[in-house]
């Protein structure tokens, strides 16, 4: 990301609300990258390093992030009309959050089955 001109702005840990199973982690890292000119819109919302947001799987896909958590990041790091790049699109939770918060998005997913799942999810909005 550094080579593309983006800096690591913030790193958080998301504590998932439910235990998926004993062989999987019940937390995930949240990495927020942006340009050097970035100014935080809500410093208070980002003071805690561990975030607690409910986890909801979608269509058997358990790796998706919480929509509330994604909205928290999008609304802090972008303005209405800006583009959000999601290089791990998954089932499209970030893209749905972008639509709901009036941001544009560019999603990348290498797994064809997961990508088609995301496209069908987005097509009903």
Name every feature range the model reports, one short phrase each.
Residues 123-124:
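Conserved phosphoryl-transfer catalytic core
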Residues 118-119:
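Conserved SAM-binding loop
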Residues 1-115:
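Core catalytic lobe of class I
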